[in-house]
Amino acid sequence: MATSRQLREQIAAGRWDAALAALYGGSEEVLSRQRSRYGAALEQFELYYGPGRQVQVYSAPGRTELGGNHTDHQHGYGLAGAVTLDLVAVASRNEDGFIRVKSRGFNKLDVIDLTEAEPQQGESTHSASLIRGIAEGFRAKGCDVGGFDAYTASDVLRGSGLSSSAAFEMGVAMILNTEYGCGLDAPALARICQFAENTYFGKPSGLLDQLTSAVGGVLFADFADPAAPKIEKIHADGVLPDGMTLCVTDTRASHSELTGEFAAIRNEMEAVAACLGGKVLGEVDEKRFWQELPRLREQCGDRAVLRAIHYFEENARTLAQRDALAAGDFAAFARLVEKSGHSSFECCQNVYCASSPKHQGLSAALAISQSILAGTGGAWRMQGGGFAGTIQAFVPDALVKRYCAAMEALFGPGCCYLLSLREQGAVRVM
């Protein structure tokens, strides 16, 4: 194991270029940026924790949701891809029983006393709660984990729908798993992270975000048994055909304060399920749902029923998307992407907040996307939890410049990201 200074010198000399190229691509422009980024993270670690420490460096990717919008928490199907935007963490084990994490862009140093295992008052919805919950998740699996000091630098947009929280969680989980020799596999780490987010952070999320960050590539998951989801990895290479670019636009309205809106989707879907004798919609007979619509409208309300309709139709669509990708039929996949986007808007109703109709950044971005991409073979949809954050578009290369210019005219310079899918999940890089 090398010290932070030794790693900085090795990175500058190009000794880690192969490892960086495997994650981000091998162009000199990309490598130069990542050398600088990793070097800066190591330097910041030294600033906060002192020089001479032996360290390891980890990477955990963000993800773009390709299908299955709000289906995973109902024990349905999910489809997502890891992206090249990631969180980098520099970490060193300590023996004092504390976890300390300083994250770029945040003033506070998170300090977690591991003798305090229970959720702490006032800590929910803060990163400290995730760290504490992840450590306790390891202990619940019989892992004897302890303290570490870490600095993180994330390029995953916070509150954007690219799952910055899952990248952060997986970074912390990778540190504990590696530094303390736990040997847990990627799905087990993902479940620990979901436990922390649900129980300690207080967000009722599904598992797809964490699984995609953990496993990498394009991931199809069947959550019929959420404790042991069936996972099928589709290799990232070849998913996008030549001449097609994945663009993600940040509408620059964070959804980080929208936990209540997200919870309402899950609660309303589960209210419909309860009326049909299930806990979640994945346990409900779809034919019976359609037969009992009048009663369900009266008992649960129209929005809950529409959200249940979205679940059933989106679930079938996600399965068809997987099959299209496996067959190399991007045209069929793109048509399904469009239908998914329309269902999120019309049925799931998570494109804007009904309580704030003046603010509809996602709606505007989708409307402009449709005006540019309709009939071109491209596709567009909102992604992630919704209400704010990002939209996703598959843009023919000939239209990328025009498309990005249109998005930047609405949301400002640098809002439109040209992304690549990433084969690797969360890893120790060096």
Model-derived features: where do they sit?
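C-terminal nucleotide
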Residues: 1-63, 88, 92-124, 220-381, ...
